[in-house]
């Protein structure tokens, strides 16, 4: 049904979905076979790098999101996530039963992770900016071209954030 086929457009691919099985491919199989767009959390905890590569090769406009919680950038410890208490430890955020509950992923780390699993930096950047903007119908965002919003970042050779520009103006993100 079209309702079932739209699920992978509104859900992090692989997460809270039955695993891919050769006799019952489920939503993951439908996305891999038919989707133009789907989203994935590239924190290397939610999805194994091998499964990420399968999705990246199968879904032309697979885009990546952080799914970050308030624990991102904070030390390990307990944090609130809605009505839940979650624990940040070893880069992950988990409920008391061990279930992943969001992430601590930042966009710059997402870029480094995508490059680490073999994507060229240009494709990794596109999957973090242009493809999500396109999915949302925001063609004036997610790309550097005349008429687009000039929101961008500059990184050094190690892909560490050095500058942030919002509407074409450099901002002091280190003291924000």
Predicted regions and their residues:
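Short beta-strands and strand-loop turn motifs
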Residues: 9-13, 39
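Short, acidic/turn-prone active-site loops that include or flank metal/cofactor-
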Residues: 13-19, 44, 68-70
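Short, Lys/Arg- and Gly-enriched loop/turn segments at beta-strand edges
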Residues: 159-164
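His/Asp/Glu-enriched, well-ordered alpha-helical/loop segment
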Residues: 26-40, 56-148, 152-155
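Catalytic core of soluble alpha/beta enzymes
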Residues: 5, 15-30
